[in-house]
């Protein structure tokens, strides 16, 4: 296949491709600067901008860190029954919507209770971290 483009000749309007944004840290959305950033994105074109975050099923207290986030959406009680808690996920999506941004949902990563390698679960990312230091319990399938 050969594609030729004459840059001196208009070919038509350019459809916006800037409508989709994303990040690793879901909890950053409701932090001061995350909320502010979502506001700027929503101002681009209200209700036409989408945002996707990783880690929506990761077990944890809901605080953000570099390359990490958590929602505690799925845990298990002492009898190994599922416990679903969408409080943090709702807070994330409510922050998107408050700012005129639509969630582009990626149901991702492994709750600790379902991981075949639950410990260590959380990683502490650094630019020099090797993959075997990062791929901890959150990344293991059941």
Residue ranges and their predicted role:
Residues 1-142:
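Non-catalytic accessory regions flanking glycosidase/transglycosidase catalytic cores in CAZymes
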């Amino acid at each position: 296949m050969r594609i030729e483009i004459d840059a001196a000749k208009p070919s038509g309007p350019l459809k916006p491709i800037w409508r989709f944004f994303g990040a690793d840290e879901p909890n950053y959305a409701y932090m001061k600067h995350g909320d502010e950033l979502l506001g700027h994105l929503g101002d681009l074109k209200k209700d036409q901008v989408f945002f996707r975050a990783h880690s929506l099923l990761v077990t944890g207290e809901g605080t953000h860190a570099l390359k990490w986030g958590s929602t505690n959406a799925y845990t298990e009680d002492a009898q190994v029954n599922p416990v679903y808690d969408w409080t943090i996920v709702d807070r994330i999506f409510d922050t998107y919507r408050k700012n005129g941004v639509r969630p582009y949902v990626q149901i991702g990563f492994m709750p600790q209770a379902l991981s075949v390698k639950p410990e260590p679960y959380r990683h502490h990312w650094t630019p020099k971290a090797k993959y075997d230091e990062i791929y901890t319990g959150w990344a293991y399938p059941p």
